[in-house]
Curated annotation (Swiss-Prot):
Organism expressing this protein natively: Erwinia tasmaniensis (strain DSM 17950 / CFBP 7177 / CIP 109463 / NCPPB 4357 / Et1/99)
PANTHER family named among the record's database cross-references: RECOMBINATION PROTEIN RECR
GO BP term (any one): DNA repair
Domain of life, source organism: Bacteria
Gene: recR
Pfam short name (any one): Toprim_4
Annotated protein name in UniProt: Recombination protein RecR
Listed InterPro entries: DNA_Rcmb_RecR, Rcmb_RecR, Rcmb_RecR_Znf, TOPRIM_dom, TOPRIM_RecR
Gene Ontology molecular function: DNA binding; zinc ion binding
SUPFAM superfamilies: Recombination protein RecR
Length: 201
């Protein structure tokens, strides 16, 4: 029997996080209350501010406190002519970590899934179409996940790009660096063979 209704509420609230079950939530709650109350207060303040102040960029739909995010507002990226389409803001972070992309993004916040009632309008493709029509975009890089839904979404966007005379490309899928061939699944291996590249001498 729980001695504190507030503690019960705290543990239940922590369970909204991905991968956090009852035991993990209990450990987190006790850690904050027993050993790090100041950290708990900072966490509470940061969560409160983030939930109330962070919205979506008017151009790319990623998370930001501003109307336009810093990436979209960067003049060098604006004139680059490249847009990379991703499924979530976390994908932007992953791509930015590579340092290999200097264009702008468009975040779908999901993917097409007719069985779940998710259509083009639900993932902002009307906004992307506006950008294709009004901006000087040279190429759209489709970086949706290599799932059935991700591939369907990429194909749909590629057809939109074709309508507006904009080049569309798909990120490569293949064997991970450092991976062993025998451990790679058949689908990935098929993509690797189909997307093989010649040596350049």
């Amino acid at each position: 029997m729980q001695t504190s209704p507030l503690l019960e509420t705290l543990m239940e609230s922590l369970r909204c996080l991905p991968g956090v079950g009852p035991k993990s939530a209990q450990r987190m709650a006790f850690q904050l209350l027993q050993r790090d109350r100041s950290g708990g207060m900072r966490l509470a303040q940061a969560l409160t501010r983030a939930m109330s102040e962070i919205g979506h960029c008017a151009d790319c739909r990623t998370f930001t406190e501003q109307e336009i995010c810093t990436i979209c507002a960067n003049p060098r990226r604006q004139h680059n002519g490249l847009i990379c389409v991703v499924e979530s803001p976390a994908d932007i972070h992953a791509i930015e970590q590579t340092g290999q992309f200097s264009g702008r993004y468009f975040v779908l916040m999901g993917h097409l899934s007719p069985l779940d009632g998710i259509g083009p309008g639900d993932i902002g493709l009307d906004r992307l179409e506006q950008r294709l029509e009004t901006e000087s975009i040279q190429e759209v890089i489709l970086a949706t996940n290599p799932t059935v839904e991700g591939e369907a979404t990429a194909n749909y966007i590629a057809s939109l790009c074709e309508q507006y005379g904009v080049d569309a490309s798909r990120i490569a899928h293949g064997v991970p660096v450092g991976g062993e061939l025998e451990m790679v699944d058949g689908t990935t291996l098929s993509h690797s063979l189909a997307g093989r590249q010649k040596f350049k001498f």
